[in-house]
Amino acid sequence: MSTESKCPFNHAAGGGTTNRDWWPKQLNLKILHQHSSLSDPMGESFDYAKEFKSLDFEAVKQDLRDVMTRSQDWWPADFGHYGPLFVRMAWHSAGTYRTGDGHGGAGAGQQRFAPLNSWPDNVSLDKARRLIWPVKQKYGRKISWADLIVLTGNVALESMGFKTFGFSGGRPDVWEPEEDVYWGSETTWLGGEERYGAQKKMQQPGDGTLVAEPENHANEESRTASGERNLENPLAAVQMGLIYVNPEGPEGVPDPVASAKDIRETFGRMAMNDEETVALIAGGHAFGKTHGAGPADNVGPEPEAAGLEEQGLGWRNKFGSGKGGDTITSGLEVTWTSTPTKWSNEYLENLFGFEWELTKSPAGAHQWTPKNGAGAGKIPDAHDPSKRHAPSMLTSDLALRFDPAYEQISRRFLNNPEQLADAFARAWFKLTHRDMGPLARYLGPETPAEELLWQDPIPNVDHALVDDQDVAALKGKILASGLSVPQLVSTAWAAASTFRGSDKRGGANGGRLRLAPQKDWAVNQPAQLAGVLKTLEGIQSEFNAAQSSGKQVSIADLIVLAGSAGVEQAAKNAGHHVTVPFTPGRADASQEQTDVESFSFLEPIADGFRNYQKGHYKVSAESLLVDKAQLLTLTAPEMAVLLGGLRVLNINVGQSKHGVFTDKPETLSNDFFKNLLDMGVEWRATSGANDTFEARDRKTGAVKWTGTRVDLVFGSHAQLRAISEVYGSSDANEKFVKDFVAAWTKVMNLDRFDLA
């Protein structure tokens, strides 16, 4: 008998066919249980903000400056300076952010983990992170990878002569890949067929003639710009594994005008307007080069597929030396300016100073070179001082010249370099800080003093706060005002549940529920909301006017307090006397401090906690519920207890009775779970789409309850049913109320970073 046949172990723990393999559409609750203490080596007592505040910030910056020009033989610096590589590293860390769901961005250092560490657009960034490992190693816990990556990009810009707008730390690392982010459904790198569906494919490359020449481009339409090309939400990249657009053009077609359409769509989904987009491209491409020294088949597997001996690196290149002048990254071989490690306006000067014709890189990728051999010898070689080149451009670069709106901005920046410098500094700061949330999270000596609208500013509290006696008195007035428990609870939920743990936006602080656009969202029942707010504002005015010591209560605080009063009253109705924890300190933002367009992305397309869905979607209602719970940073038990409690408190949008499995509404009982688990009823679908159901008494056939998919999933899904059985047990009443209050308080305080 052979040695192999004696061994009974063919697979390690966790291998084999999984539940997901058997049931691909099974509801995924794992996204609610990420980033726990079980995966965090720092321990639960670790306080990153405290550690960062003790950092010798200037010493870190000096160490990074030293790294910039200390070229390493194992990965030589282009032009003797790593600055452009580090700018790309920071850009690609932050540039995954998208407004639709707040996911992506630099805030958690996810570039270290799959899939981002192995995206085709991130080739060679594995080396960039290794180059700064000595700095990370030196300062250890005092600076996270997430902060260091962004800071390195800032220092790189400064070391190349650019004045940045500022830098703020405060991005604690996570220690595992984020499984909750939807990056697309394609199963091949650079695939785009799923995100564009069955839409018309781009035409094949033309003969290298620009779609629109300078003298008449405003009147000539791209052969593809008019075609239907709608990117799937919430994605903000045109192909799987790219940050934004294909630099060769849509689907590799070198059409600058069509490329502009993709650029506008993807950068817009990253919260950038046209001016910010032009500034980022023109500013970023003032530096460095792209790499396409040879055919892509010389490049080995990405980090996640590479062998153990590669130690987390990937894309080993067998072309020539595999590095330096033989580097293959994107397959494009473009250097934009003659001073690629020094800030200048030459990118725009070259863009408009030459006429361009299509050519190919040594790797066979579409790129552009000046016509008639113009510009020859203007550009230095990255590694061989004896060689010179002509400037070159990407299809996506030419979009800034041949798209009418981009061209107007680009020419203004060309003629006013100081405007480009200011716009790039501000856009770079926004790019690298967009997912950090409120200013309370910003740390460090270089945090800008200027208040920026995209930061969702909230005024500082400049008055004394209410004390326990005031809180009790205010709750009494609220409960005596005639407002019902559902009105109080639903209003507080509407305010707080806008929070997104992804980009730390939303929440009750700021009192923006009373402002556009939130006051007009259908999910918030505008007519009812207006009446509730009018009553609460009256209570606020009366209280504030009666104070002689400067004590005040904000409407933001009062909305949350009113919800707490409603929960306490509902618990009292069930025979439980509880006090919902309340911490004052919220402030009221103004309409002028609120970007209506930006806040529109926080409007929920579905809120299962209020049994609301705006439309019909491919994604199941229960999956949308889990997605909402994940954005609220809830665990599966917290999601369950909140939904079960909110159902019996009767806060459904439109006063729908779906899921209100109780004869005692406005009473905080565990009736939702008890009646859902009742075997005396039989559930049947009442719609062809299987999205509404009714429960009929097995003996009489009478309809007893109605519900939606988000209600029935708590009895259908095995894991959720197990949780429901805990809360539906006869001895669970007290635990249910206690857990509901804890989960409610968590949601009310999700945006209170000032309490951390």
UniProtKB/Swiss-Prot annotation:
There is a cross-link at Y244-M270 (Tryptophyl-tyrosyl-methioninium (Tyr-Met) (with W-91)). The keyword Heme applies. Gene3D superfamilies: 1.10.520.10, Peroxidase, domain 2. Its EC number is 1.11.1.21. Binds 1 heme b (iron(II)-protoporphyrin IX) group per dimer. There is a cross-link at W91-Y244 (Tryptophyl-tyrosyl-methioninium (Trp-Tyr) (with M-270)). Formation of the three residue Trp-Tyr-Met cross-link is important for the catalase, but not the peroxidase activity of the enzyme. Disulfide bonds: none annotated. The record marks R88 as: Transition state stabilizer. It is an enzyme of class 1 (oxidoreductase). One of its GO terms (biological process) is cellular response to hydrogen peroxide. GO terms for cellular component: cytosol. Its cofactor is heme b. One of its GO terms (molecular function) is heme binding. Heme b binds at H285. It catalyses: H2O2 + AH2 = A + 2 H2O; 2 H2O2 = O2 + 2 H2O. Transmembrane segments: none annotated. Keywords: Heme, Hydrogen peroxide, Iron, Metal-binding, Oxidoreductase, Peroxidase. Residues 198-230, 371-390 are annotated as: Disordered. Belongs to the peroxidase family. Peroxidase/catalase subfamily. Bifunctional enzyme with both catalase and broad-spectrum peroxidase activity. Homodimer or homotetramer. NCBIfam families: cat_per_HPI, PRK15061.1. This is Catalase-peroxidase. It comes from Pseudomonas savastanoi pv. phaseolicola (strain 1448A / Race 6) (Pseudomonas syringae pv. phaseolicola (strain 1448A / Race 6)). The lineage of its organism: Bacteria, Pseudomonadati, Pseudomonadota, Gammaproteobacteria, Pseudomonadales. The gene is katG.
